[in-house]
């Protein structure tokens, strides 16, 4: 946010361009709590209301200067309609408006409009999130190849306990290199070839010789491969 990534080729400008995708997103509170939870909260609020006030806290609220209300954070509205590049992450140092863009390290040089999606006339949404999804799943020019590897690694971790990349949240320089890069690439290719369907990949992993090996421990096996 305030400077370029020190380890991976991710400049701060990429951050703000990605951030602009969600600038116009409207956040709303949705009532999805069941009656049982709502009743418990109401009871707790009534109990708190009957609790004698804390003198020190009350004095602080009455006499203190306090802070200006932050409507954006408490109510989720209104929102900024623009995103700006900020020097050193400071809101006092705007460096021009940031248009929607994506990570340069995961994009081939060229016109970014290849991912752009225009909503129909009269639509009440910008289409930015659809554009983002087009870039994320583009295996030829966007982040699709990395996305496939990340998904495959998560599935492998789910079934084996540890991913082919032991740091599933970090595929960068500070993460752990894959133990079997060829296998990771091959499985990612299978995922893409199957139209991003996860079920065939689950079936493939579960029917593999690696998964069907015995998990019984012995001193001889532990000495040969203590990390397994």
Model-derived regions: residue spans:
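Primarily short, surface-exposed interaction patches in extracytoplasmic proteins
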Residues: 8-9, 37-228
């Amino acid at each position: 946010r305030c400077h370029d990534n020190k380890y991976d080729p991710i400049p701060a400008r990429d951050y703000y361009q990605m951030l602009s995708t969600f600038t116009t997103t409207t956040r709303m509170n949705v009532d999805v709590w069941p009656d049982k939870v709502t009743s418990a909260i109401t009871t707790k609020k009534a109990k708190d209301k009957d609790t004698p006030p804390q003198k020190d806290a009350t004095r602080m609220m009455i006499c203190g200067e306090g802070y200006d209300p932050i409507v954006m954070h408490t109510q989720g509205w209104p929102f900024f309609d623009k995103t700006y590049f900020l020097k050193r992450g400071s809101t006092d140092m705007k460096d021009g408006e940031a248009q929607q863009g994506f990570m340069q390290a995961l994009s081939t040089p060229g016109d970014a409009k290849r991912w752009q999606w225009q909503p129909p006339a009269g639509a009440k949404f910008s289409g930015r999130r659809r554009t983002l999804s087009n870039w994320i799943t583009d295996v030829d020019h966007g982040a699709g190849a990395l996305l496939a590897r990340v998904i495959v690694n998560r599935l492998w971790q789910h079934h084996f306990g540890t991913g082919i990349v032991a740091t599933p949240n970090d595929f960068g320089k500070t993460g752990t290199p894959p133990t079997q890069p060829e296998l990771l690439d091959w499985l990612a290719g299978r995922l893409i070839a199957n139209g991003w369907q996860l079920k065939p990949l689950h079936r493939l992993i579960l029917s593999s010789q690696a998964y069907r090996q015995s998990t019984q421990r012995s001193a001889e096996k532990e000495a040969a491969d203590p990390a397994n």
